[in-house]
Amino acid sequence: MGVNEEGYNELTLSNIKDKEQIYLKAQKDYDELVQHNFTQRILNDKDSIVDGIYNERIKKVHTQTIDLAKNVNVGGEYLTNVGLSKDTIVGLSNTLNVGVDNKVRVAKNSHEFVGENKDIEIGANQ
């Protein structure tokens, strides 16, 4: 770092009992290159905040296992684009709540199978 430059990088190691911590600060950019495997295990919680744009690209397979629950909150639009096919399997019930309009577009064939009962309620025009 030059004499007149402000800002700094920091690496701190603390071994104080019950306050053990490794702290890393990059004043500007932080890059990692792992030429083989990268394994991470967190025995408690993980929190991340990204103040800008978050991009992630996975060139092969992405597998995610969640043992309890998953909540996703999106403040604006949400788009899912699948190149080939998409299957959704729900063990018990599935509910879709739409605030205004719901549209389904099928380019060719559509099939619906109901094992027992089907009820349709229309509040106004048919």
Residue ranges of predicted features:
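Structural signature for extended repeat/solenoid scaffolds and their inter-repeat hinge/linker regions
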Residues: 1-126
